[in-house]
From Swiss-Prot:
It is a single-pass type II membrane protein. GO terms for biological process: cytochrome complex assembly. SUPFAM superfamilies: Heme chaperone CcmE. The chain crosses the membrane at residues 9-29. It comes from the Bacteria. Heme binds at H129, Y133. Its main location: membrane. Heme chaperone required for the biogenesis of c-type cytochromes. Transiently binds heme delivered by CcmC and transfers the heme to apo-cytochromes in a process facilitated by CcmF and CcmH. This is Cytochrome c-type biogenesis protein CcmE. It is found in: Cell inner membrane. Residues 30-161 are periplasmic.
Amino acid sequence: MNPRRQKRLGIILAILIGVSATIGLMIYALNQNMDLFYTPTELVNGKDDGTKPEVGQRLRIGGMVVMGSVRRDPESLKVRFDLADVGPKVTIEYEGILPDLFREGQGIVAQGVLKDATTVEAFEVLAKHDEEYMPPEIAEAMKKTHAPLQYSEEQKQGSGQ
């Protein structure tokens, strides 16, 4: 093999090794950051295909905060509450300031780590609201600046052409 061909082969091998390493690192990073979504029933009973998360696995869980289940530690920001859908309850432990929309009976999504079969240690809690929600400040500002539209009879009838 002449030196020119040997140099080309070395460059091609280096490029292939570099691309393979890059793809491998990207797949590893995506697997580390992938959080699977569960409902409380799926967390306890498993998904339809029978898969259940392992203790220590990162996940997202969504459901309704059970009425009367919120327990706050008076000496810290620790909060424990139960989350349920139509089946079993799951306990969420969170340390931090809860969102303004958080309340009992409200839908939330918590992101965290599975501590045991029915307990999730959350590091983020998101309160859910419907698409018609508008913060009070914005609603008030819109009332001041946007007058209701007045339509003529012709506009209400539409152009009959």
